[in-house]
């Protein structure tokens, strides 16, 4: 049996797409940019929130200043609303519990920012023992970088 299993968070342990879409649309609206349907966000996510914002912004508006503005409003909203519609996938908590009971170490490595990753793990999996929960941090490349 494996000694350690490392999971991604968004799209693996948790279905976060609705809260990501709503929060990004909030930020886009606050900055005067067009919003997107939730389904479109499946094409925007992956590689961290900076990439999410770059993909959600109109092509001609993808400057670092605009990404920073969208990020600021996104974090303001998402930090309060990141559990509104987010849910664990079926049987995930059961799987994690079984792994814990068999002595398998469990960790999370996510491109979601660190504070958001920790908050969601604590909120949705309070009874699960994770040996490490790592999200996106300044100065550390996002996955899949080593």
List the predicted regions and their residue ranges.
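Metal-dependent phosphoesterase signature
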Residues: 31, 55-94, 102-104
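Helix-loop "lid/cap" segments that line or gate small-molecule binding pockets
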Residues: 27-28, 48-63, 120
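Substrate-recognition element of Asp-dependent hydrolases with the DxDx(T/V) motif
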Residues: 95-122
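Substrate-recognition "cap/lid" segment bordering the active-site pocket of phosphatases
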Residues: 84-87, 113-146
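Hydrophobic "anchor" residues on beta-strands that sit immediately upstream
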Residues: 4, 107, 132
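Phosphate- and divalent-cation-binding pockets in alpha/beta enzyme and binding domains
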Residues: 23, 52, 91, 116-119
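Active-site neighborhood of HAD-like aspartate-dependent phosphohydrolases
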Residues: 1-43
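Core-facing hydrophobic residues within beta-strands of well-ordered domains
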Residues: 2, 96, 128-131
């Amino acid at each position: 049996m494996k000694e350690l299993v490392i999971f991604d968070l968004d799209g693996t342990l948790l279905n976060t797409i609705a809260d990501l879409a709503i929060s990004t649309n909030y930020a886009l609206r606050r900055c005067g940019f067009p919003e997107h349907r939730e389904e479109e966000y499946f094409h925007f996510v992956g590689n961290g929130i900076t990439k999410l914002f770059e993909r959600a912004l109109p092509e001609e508006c993808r400057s670092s200043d605009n990404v920073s503005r969208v990020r600021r409003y996104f974090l303001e909203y998402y930090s309060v609303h990141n559990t509104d519609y987010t849910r664990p996938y079926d049987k995930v908590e059961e799987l994690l519990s079984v792994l814990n009971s068999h002595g398998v170490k469990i960790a999370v490595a996510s491109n979601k920012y660190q504070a958001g990753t920790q908050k969601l793990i604590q909120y949705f999996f309070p009874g699960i023992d994770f040996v490490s929960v790592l999200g996106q941090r300044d100065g550390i490349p996002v996955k899949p970088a080593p």
